[in-house]
Regions:
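Basic, Lys/Arg-enriched alpha-helical interface segments
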Residues: 3-56, 60
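Intrinsically disordered, low-complexity segments enriched in polar/charged small residues
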Residues: 8-11, 58, 66, 88-94
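Basic/aromatic recognition patch in beta-strand/loop cores that engages polyanionic ligands
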Residues: 48-78
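Short, low-complexity, polar/charged sequence segments that are solvent-exposed and flexible
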Residues: 23-26, 62, 82, 91
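Enriched for short, Lys/Arg-rich terminal
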Residues: 68, 73-97
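Absolute protein N-terminus
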Residues: 1-2, 97
């Protein structure tokens, strides 16, 4: 099975996303995180299907999941998730503070 690793900031992003959505719908929050986990496994098996995001950093790729975007980099036998952000946010500012 392909590996999916998460940087601490990605873990924090997921907690923030779940907490925000769960205020209105804990079930909806659970479903979104399940979908992110499923897509992460797909990306780990085929890491180059995401869009190259060289403007954010070397080897960074992105993949949309609903209103969110998963940012990751391919690693040996999988991916490492860097961030999970809402698509309406200023992505470049968050990567280059």
């Amino acid at each position: 099975m392909a590996k999916v690793l998460r940087k601490p900031q990605a873990e924090a992003d997921l907690i923030e996303i779940w907490t925000y959505i769960a205020q209105d719908s804990p079930t909806g929050a659970d479903k979104l995180l399940d979908e992110i986990d499923e897509k992460s496994q797909t990306l780990a098996q085929s890491p180059f299907i995401g869009k190259a995001r060289d403007e954010l950093g070397s080897k960074i790729r992105s993949f949309p999941i609903g209103n969110y975007v998963l940012f990751y980099q391919p690693i040996e036998d999988g991916i490492e998730i860097i961030r999970v952000l809402h698509g309406a946010r200023d992505i470049e500012a968050l990567f280059n503070p």
